[in-house]
């Protein structure tokens, strides 16, 4: 239990009435790691209905790896507003972009570039669906439910499993699912993964920039929910070395043409384009230019090799998978299985649109 935490006592205060015109707005942003999130709250005298109504704020960037101490203020520009599933009422979660003292995007602000690309490709209506895999850990960073001095049984019974000896952490998963729905995130499902204590949730279909916004906010909610259960979430793509599956962020992608009659031809064309820029995508698909994915994309445990591009129907060992139903109906989408679990969804979606929609190499 976190020191000083008492959820029963906290609930007493969360049920207190606050004036109708007051709103607690929690500003949320990606920090200097490009992976972790930070947040802080301010009181408003109105209930915002859109990001444009919210004031620009700032924070100490020297404490988040985003500025020098001698010039530490970094600006927060609100870009998306969600209902707050923790405080409820009129209270809001506010996703923000970060800008430096000179009003230029911070180094880890990947959203502005993604927004430019999505605007240019808007007439093609790019849709995304991202499958966020993650692993639950005890507070001591040991996989949740695993024996302290050993390992669970081999992989096999855990995927979509049922039972206390097969799944660990379902309370966190269910609470997160409901929190996302309450917040207004387009979450579409969840399931237990092949490795015990590993789970996945899916967000989408989302069009354009909404994909990155919803996924980052869903990640924030996951960490906050896990905090309430004294559980740690890791997005490490290979948290446990050895004969255990890694974690990815498989990304489903389509354009209006792919979803139309005989869209399989557009899908095949997209795969051909992707095959020519494999290395560029690998560098974009984790925060460390491919170093994280080197541990995961080995050609084993339902992954492709990081060094080779491949594609196939219903092939979970390929870089790009065409679902069986898509191949049969000749319309639909493709699945890019290369992105790492800790990849930035703005970077992944931007890279796909640049390659497939804008023909940039």
Swiss-Prot record:
The UniProt annotation places ATP binding at 131, 200-205, 252-254, 316, 321
Segments forming domain GS catalytic = 110-361
Question: Might you name a Gene Ontology BP term for this protein?
Answer: glutamine biosynthetic process
Residues annotated to bind ADP: 333-335
In what residue span(s) does the GS beta-grasp domain sit? 23-103
Spell out the subcellular localization from the entry.
Cytoplasm, Cytosol; Microsome; Mitochondrion
Reaction equations catalysed: L-glutamate + NH4(+) + ATP = L-glutamine + ADP + phosphate + H(+)
Q: Which InterPro entries match?
A: Gln_synt_N, Gln_synt_N_sf, Gln_synth/guanido_kin_cat_dom, Gln_synth_cat_dom, Gln_synth_gly_rich_site, Gln_synth_N_conserv_site, Glutamine_Synthetase
Question: For binding Mn(2+) 1, which residues are annotated in this chain's numbering?
Answer: 131, 250, 335
**What's its job?**
Glutamine synthetase that catalyzes the ATP-dependent conversion of glutamate and ammonia to glutamine.
Under PANTHER family, the record lists: GLUTAMINE SYNTHETASE, GLUTAMINE SYNTHETASE 2 CYTOPLASMIC
Q: What is this protein called?
A: Glutamine synthetase
